[in-house]
C-alpha cells in the first residue's frame, strides 16, 4: 500500500464546495469517483488540506489517498485527469511517507482574493473576481491590513454558526496590492476559521470604499464579535493559492503553478 499526494486546481463555480454532500456535485465526490474508476470499482477515500465553500476556487489544493496500485506519480496525473471533469485538473503528484497527512501536516496556507475595479465588469472574469465600481482607497486598506499580522483571536472574522471554540490564529503575511484588473488581496497564515478570509476581505472593502476608517480594524479585532466586522465577501473572488508543508512535496514544484492571474 502506497500513499500518494496530489495537487489540484479547480474552478469552483459549478461545485457545492469541496466536501462530499449527498445529492450535490462536489470536488471530493468527483475525485473519489475518478479514483474508483481507476481502481476498478473499489472505493478510495481522499483527504484534503481543507474544505472550500461553494464557488471558491483553488490552484493549490493538496490531497492524499492510499492505493495498492503501482503507478508512477506522473502517470497518476494523466490517469486522474483522464477520469476527471474539465473543471478539475491534477497538476502534480508524488509518493509520500505513510504518515503524511494532507490536512494535519499543513504548516501554512495562502489564499488570494481577486477584485475587478472600474465602471464595467470584465465578463470573462465574472466567475473569478468580484467587481467593484467605485474607486478604492488602497493605502487605507493596506494600513488596516497590517493590524491583522501576528497571533490574534479572530472571533470577529469567523462565521457566527461555527462550532470551533479556539479562534486564535496566526497571520504571517497580508498584502493589498494593485493588479492589472484591479486589486489582489493575499493572506497567509498557519490556519483559518470558517469564512475568515472572506470576512476580512469584506471588511477591507468597506474601508476601501470609505464606509469605515482603517483604525477600525484594530477595534474590530479587539471586540471579538462577528457583528463588528464587515459583510462576508462573495465566494467567487477567493482562491486557495498554496498549501505549505515545510518542504516541497512535488518535483519542480512552484506555488500557484496554475495561476488565477
Swiss-Prot record:
* GO BP terms: tRNA pseudouridine synthesis
- Record flagged with keyword Isomerase: yes
Do the record's keywords include tRNA processing?
A: yes
Identify the catalytic residues.
53 (nucleophile)
Residues bound to substrate: 111
The cross-references to SUPFAM superfamilies, in alphabetical order and at most eight, read:
Pseudouridine synthase (SSF55120)
Enzyme Commission (EC) number: 5.4.99.12
Taxonomic superkingdom:
Bacteria
Reactions listed under catalytic activity:
uridine(38/39/40) in tRNA = pseudouridine(38/39/40) in tRNA
One example GO MF annotation: RNA binding
Q: Which keywords fit this entry according to its UniProt record?
A: Isomerase, tRNA processing
Taken from the UniProt record, the cysteine pairs bridged by disulfide bonds within this chain are none
User: What does the subunit comment say?
Assistant: Homodimer.
Give the protein family. Answer: Belongs to the tRNA pseudouridine synthase TruA family.
Q: What does this protein do?
A: Formation of pseudouridine at positions 38, 39 and 40 in the anticodon stem and loop of transfer RNAs.
Q: What is this protein called?
A: tRNA pseudouridine synthase A
Tell me which species this is from: Shouchella clausii (strain KSM-K16)
Give the lineage: Bacteria, Bacillati, Bacillota, Bacilli, Bacillales
